[in-house]
Curated annotation (Swiss-Prot):
Organism of this sequence: Haemophilus influenzae (strain ATCC 51907 / DSM 11121 / KW20 / Rd)
GO molecular function: formyltetrahydrofolate deformylase activity
Active site (record annotation): D223
Domain annotation ACT: ranges: 6-85
EC top class, as a word: hydrolase
NCBIfam families: PRK06027.1, PurU
Pathway: Purine metabolism; IMP biosynthesis via de novo pathway; formate from 10-formyl-5,6,7,8-tetrahydrofolate: step 1/1
Any Gene Ontology biological process: 'de novo' IMP biosynthetic process
Protein name: Formyltetrahydrofolate deformylase
Catalytic activity: (6R)-10-formyltetrahydrofolate + H2O = (6S)-5,6,7,8-tetrahydrofolate + formate + H(+)
Keywords recorded for this protein, A-Z: Hydrolase, One-carbon metabolism, Purine biosynthesis
Family stated for the protein in its record: Belongs to the PurU family.
SUPFAM superfamilies attached to this UniProt entry: ACT-like, Formyltransferase
Length: 278
């Protein structure tokens, strides 16, 4: 059966890598629909994303690539089927609402398996879209206890990605390790500036002239994970902290949905706490 798949390759840079990869694909009678590559000259590392069509013998293809490419090569062959996400929320609706609307009208090609909140405020919004909402309250629980319950509920849906749509709790290291490079967060500032809570108040006090938002994968350092997408807007001295917050919400939802779209289409490589987007 003819299928479409995406081949993601990264390895130490060397001469002739593109030719080697494309020749192997040709020998497997696979048609290359799109191809993008990048070399990081500082780290001497090569990245390539290849969209393929044909009849796949996945094990043999990956074995041939491994034999022909440098020893430290990473190759992944990914199907193009629709991906599943679980969204985590607290009380703010703008990022969640944007994802729900874009998914409803087909602008995001994703299955939203469930939305989980540590408060119940957004249940009505979610259920209007006929999507399950689950309350996993943090009250009277330690962070570890709450995150354990949260992970158990998430795992019922086997998502490809977990999206933190203004989820306002810090996740413990065990939770993060359970989903490496699969948890996407939106931070309400242009990282690495103004990490942590109340970034707009911090920005106002500093008299900044731009405010922004950052979507990133989470790791065990607060707001320090690999950055996927950023954007900014101009502000001036007439903006107080509340006006900055209102303007920032528009940037946040746009940046998060763009980052999610990149992940859904397998365009992100994570390397040395940075991302390469192809």
């Amino acid at each position: 059966m003819i299928e479409k798949k995406i081949l993601l390759t990264d390895c130490p840079d060397d001469k002739g890598l593109i030719a080697k990869i494309t020749n192997i694909c040709y020998k497997h009678q696979l048609n290359i629909l799109h191809n993008n590559e990048f070399v990081d000259f500082e780290t001497k590392h090569f990245f390539m994303r290849t969209e393929l069509e044909g009849i796949f013998n996945e094990a043999t293809l990956l074995e041939d690539l491994k034999y022909s490419l440098p020893e430290e090569t990473n190759c992944r062959l990914i199907g193009t089927q629709r991906k599943r996400i679980v969204i985590l929320v607290t009380k703010e609706a703008h990022c969640l609402g944007d994802i729900l609307m874009k998914n409803y009208y087909g602008a995001l090609d994703v299955e939203i398996a469930a939305v989980i909140g540590n408060h119940d405020n957004l249940r009505e919004l979610v259920e209007r879209f006929n999507i399950p909402f689950h309350l996993v309250s943090h009250e009277n629980l330690t962070r570890v206890e709450h995150d354990k319950l949260l992970a158990e509920k998430i795992d019922e849906y086997t998502p490809d990605y977990i999206v933190l749509a203004k989820y306002m709790r810090v996740l413990n290291p065990e939770f993060v390790a359970r989903y490496p490079n699969r948890v996407i967060n939106i931070h309400h500032s242009f990282l690495p500036a103004f990490i942590g809570a109340k970034p707009y108040q911090q920005a106002y006090k500093r008299g900044v002239k731009i405010i922004g938002a950052t979507a990133h994968f989470i790791n065990n350092e607060l707001d320090q994970g690999p950055i996927i997408m950023q954007n900014v807007i101009n502000v001036d001295h007439t903006y107080n902290a509340e006006a900055m917050m209102r303007a920032g919400r528009d940037v946040e939802k746009t940046v998060l949905s763009r980052a999610l779209d990149l992940a859904l289409h397998d365009r992100i490589f994570v390397y040395k706490n940075k991302t390469v987007v192809l």
